[in-house]
Amino acid sequence: MSASTTATLRHDWTLAEVRALFVQPFNDLLFQAQTLHRAHFDANRVQVSTLLSIKTGACPEDCKYCPQSGHYNTGLEKEKLLEVQKVLEEAARAKSIGSTRFCMGAAWKHPSAKDMPYVLEMVKGVKAMGLETCMTLGRLDQEQTEALATAGLDYYNHNLDTSPEFYGSIITTRTYGERLQTLAYVRDAGMKICSGGILGMGESLDDRAGLLIQLANLPEHPESVPINMLVKVAGTPLENAEDVDPFDFIRMLAVARILMPQSHVRLSAGREAMNEQMQALAFFAGANSIFYGDKLLTTANPQADKDMLLFSRLGIKPEAGEGHADEVHQAAIEQALVEQQSSAMFYDAASA
C-alpha cells in the first residue's frame, strides 16, 4: 500500500491544493479516489439510509434552493409534526427493506421546547428497533444537543451547503458561524456528524473546493458527507439554475473522498435525475452511502426496486447492520426481479 493511502488524516487543506485535485485529468482523479476508497472501505459495500420528513413546510429560513421555505410559493402544504407512532411505523418499514439507518428531518429553524419531548421519543423508539438514528432539525443549542445524545441519537445532520464566501448569496436567515457552532455542539455531545453541501446553485469551482475544505479542516472529519445535486423546484429562486455537468458532480464526489478518506460520502439529493451509468461512476469515485426509498424529504428519489436491481448488476451489497441486512437485501433483489417482468416496472437506463 502506498504512502498516500496510509497517511494520517489531514485538517490543513489549502485552496490551491484542492483546486489542483479538481482540475487534474478525470481518470487520474478517479484512480486516486478509488485507491483511497479501497484502503479504508470495502469497495463493493454501500451504506443504506431511509429519510422521513417528520415535519414538512413553512420553514422560516430563506434557503433559495428549498421548497420547504415559507418565503416561496412552491405549492407545498404545511404539515404538523408527525405522531411518534407513525414515525416508528415508517422506521419499521425502512428496516424491512434493508435500511440500516433511519433519518428524520424537520423543517424548522430550530426545534421548540414543546416539540423536543416528541422528538426524543422518536429517537428512543427507532433506536430500540436496532436501527442507527439520524436527525436534522435545524440549529441546536447545547441543552438540546445533549438531550438528543442522551436519547441515543447517533448522527446529526447539519449541512454547510456551500463555501463561506458564497453562502450569503443563498441564505440570509442563518449565519455560517451558527452552522459551525451547531456542529461543534454535536461533536462535543459525543454524536457523529453528517454534513455536506449542494452543487448547482451558481457556485464557482473555488466555492465547491471551499465547502470541502471547511468540512475536511474541522477538528474531526464528519462521519457522513452528503453531496447533493440541486433539485430545481418551481417557485424557488433557483428553479432556473443551470444544470450541473455530470462529470463535475463526479469530480466533487472524488475530491470529497480524497480529502476525507474515512468518511462515508453520500450520493444524496438529485439521484433521481442520474442514469445508471452516472450512479455507477459515483460509486467508483468513492460514494458509499445512499438514501433508499421513494422520497427524499419532498422530492422524488429512485424507487427502491430500481436501487436493488442496480446494486445487483454492479455487484454491490449494503453495509451490514443489525437485522441481517444481507438477507433482507437479497430478498429485495429477488422481489424486484419478479416485479421487473411487468413492463410497467421495467427500468430502461437508456431513457432514464
Curated annotation (Swiss-Prot):
SMART domains: BATS (SM00876), Elp3 (SM00729). GO terms for molecular function: 2 iron, 2 sulfur cluster binding; 4 iron, 4 sulfur cluster binding; biotin synthase activity; iron ion binding. [2Fe-2S] cluster binds at residues 103, 134, 194, 266. [4Fe-4S] cluster binds at residues 59, 63, 66. It comes from the Bacteria. Its EC number is 2.8.1.6. Its cofactor is [4Fe-4S] cluster; [2Fe-2S] cluster. Gene3D superfamilies: Aldolase class I (3.20.20.70). Keywords: 2Fe-2S, 4Fe-4S, Biotin biosynthesis, Iron, Iron-sulfur, Metal-binding, S-adenosyl-L-methionine, Transferase. GO terms for biological process: biotin biosynthetic process. InterPro entries: Aldolase_TIM (IPR013785), BATS_dom (IPR010722), Biotin_synth/BioAB (IPR002684), Biotin_synthase (IPR024177), Elp3/MiaA/NifB-like_rSAM (IPR006638), rSAM (IPR007197). Residues 44-262 form the Radical SAM core domain. Pfam families: BATS, Radical_SAM. Binds 1 [4Fe-4S] cluster. The cluster is coordinated with 3 cysteines and an exchangeable S-adenosyl-L-methionine. Binds 1 [2Fe-2S] cluster. The cluster is coordinated with 3 cysteines and 1 arginine. It catalyses: (4R,5S)-dethiobiotin + (sulfur carrier)-SH + 2 reduced [2Fe-2S]-[ferredoxin] + 2 S-adenosyl-L-methionine = (sulfur carrier)-H + biotin + 2 5'-deoxyadenosine + 2 L-methionine + 2 oxidized [2Fe-2S]-[ferredoxin]. Pathway: Cofactor biosynthesis; biotin biosynthesis; biotin from 7,8-diaminononanoate: step 2/2. HAMAP family: BioB (MF_01694). Belongs to the radical SAM superfamily. Biotin synthase family. Catalyzes the conversion of dethiobiotin (DTB) to biotin by the insertion of a sulfur atom into dethiobiotin via a radical-based mechanism. Homodimer. This is Biotin synthase. The lineage of its organism: Bacteria, Pseudomonadati, Pseudomonadota, Gammaproteobacteria, Pseudomonadales.
